[in-house]
Structures are given as structure tokens and as C-alpha cells.
Amino acid sequence: MRQFSMLSVLLLVLLIASPLAGAADIPEVLRISAIPDENPNELLRIYAPFAEYLTRELKMKVRFTPVVDYAATVEGLAAKKLDMVWYGGFTSVQAVRRTNGTAKRLVLRQEDAEFKSVFIAKPGSGIRVLGDLKGKTFAFGSVSSTSGHLMPRFFILKAKLHPDKDFKQVAYSGAHDATALWVESGRVDAGALNFLVWEKLVETKKVDLSKVNVFWTTPPYADYVWTVRGDLDKGLQERITSAFLKLDYQNPEGKRLLDLHRTKKYIKANDEDWKGIEEAAVAADLLR
């Protein structure tokens, strides 16, 4: 009997020591991605340097994996084909739901704690307030975009307008920069997009302000956030978080990366901050 007990203890010790028992999930290659809210070349320009930085900081291979649409980032994280994604607020809510509450938000830009959408129209269109959109053609970005669809739709509904009933036509451009170009070209009368993308388009002279400008800006809300799959090794999650938090705008490399993401600082995420996004999605009938 004593021999059997000793054998049981030995087997238990071996099982606990086995790399298969409660093994931390540390992938050979950390696969990062981002919602495709801008054109593919721009996304590669932004995120490839982040992959290089994380490779050095984490001392492991990190690869940026582009995707074709917003849904692919959600499904990719759920299927463990992606390890970390730069989500918009709405897609982060979808990812948390799709992974049964396990996806974990890590860090966001300080601007994302109080993000905004801008509504744009052609000067001389007669559109000055949300109520003027009635009977007009309008462009959102992607269906799954927080700043390009969900929150603009939410504030339109609060203004007692229903886009699908009160607008002449609703279209989806698929990306923030595309929305701006659609309005500028006259393809649609008005549209809504991410305020940081709008500022970048203005600064880089990608839009002509004599042909398109902002007529309304939303109140602030929580938006973009780096999110990992929940079963990723906790120590690795902490190292990823530290790598972003240590980026210093006074340091040349830190400034280069932070400028790519149009921020000066990352801050830790608090899951409670996205409850409002989830409630807005339910109110807009985009989540059940």
C-alpha cells in the first residue's frame, strides 16, 4: 500500500513538472494584427515597425499579419490564429463576446480614453447640424467600425433621426480615409470618421478643405485598444504591456513609434471603460 502511495506521488510530481500540464501559452511567433480601417499600405507602414520593436523588447519573433476585414480580426483571435489585435472599441467588444469573455484589453493611447468622431460635408451643402442630414446621402466607414459607424449612428439616433429611414441613401466606404474622399468627390453628401484620421488627412493635405470640412464632432467615448487572447501566457501579457508603457516621446525611437500611432503616450486599459460602447451597440441594434 505504501509502495502504491509513493508511486502515486511520483506520478503526480512528474505530471505537474510536465510542460503539457498547465503549460503557459507562449507562441513561437507572436502574431499581431489591426482592424483594416485605412488602406493596406498605410497599415503596413504603421504596424511593421511595432512588430520590429516588440521583437526586440520581448526577445521573440513578432509578425504583423494583415487581414481583409474587421470580422477576420475577431475570428482570428477566437481561433488562435492571431495573438494580439489593435481593435476599435466595438470590435474589442465583439472579440470579448466571441471568446466567451476571455480576450483581454491591455493598453490604449491616451487619446482613446476620450475618442471622437467627426461628421463632414461639402461647404455650401446646407448641412450644419445633424438634423440637416435628413434626405441626404451619407457614408459610414466599415459596418464594424466604432468611430466610423457605431458611435456616429448612436448620436444620429439620439438626434431623433434613423439613418436607414430618414437618409436618402446610406453607404459603407470600408475605411475612414475612403469616407473623406467620398464626401470630397461628391459621391455622398456627408459622412463620419475617426477624428485622428481626419487630422492626419488635413495635416498631410490629402483632403481639400475648400471641398470638405467638419460640421459636428461627437462627445468623447472609449475606443481603440490593444487586445490579446486570454489564454496567452500572463507573463508575456505583462511584458507586452510594459513594452508599450515604456515608450517615451523624448526618446527618438519612442517618438517614431508614437508618432506612427498619432499619440504621445500609452496607458493601461480598464475593461469597464468599454461598457458604454457595448450599451451603444445594443441601442443601435448592432449587438443583441
List where the protein language model places each region:
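Short helices/loops that flank or line small-molecule/ion binding pockets
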Residues: 71-85, 98-99, 131, 175-196
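Bacterial N-terminal signal peptides that target proteins for export
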Residues: 1-9
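Extracytoplasmic small-molecule ligand-binding "clamshell" domains
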Residues: 25-91
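Hydrophobic/proline-rich hinge and linker segments of small-molecule sensing/allosteric domains
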Residues: 106-129, 226-229
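Sec/Tat signal peptide C-region and signal peptidase I cleavage site
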Residues: 19-23
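Pocket-lining segment of extracytoplasmic ligand-binding domains
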Residues: 125, 136-235
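Bacterial N-terminal signal peptides
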Residues: 8-18
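An extracytoplasmic/periplasmic, membrane-proximal ligand-sensing/linker region
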Residues: 27-34, 38-49, 221-223, 227-288
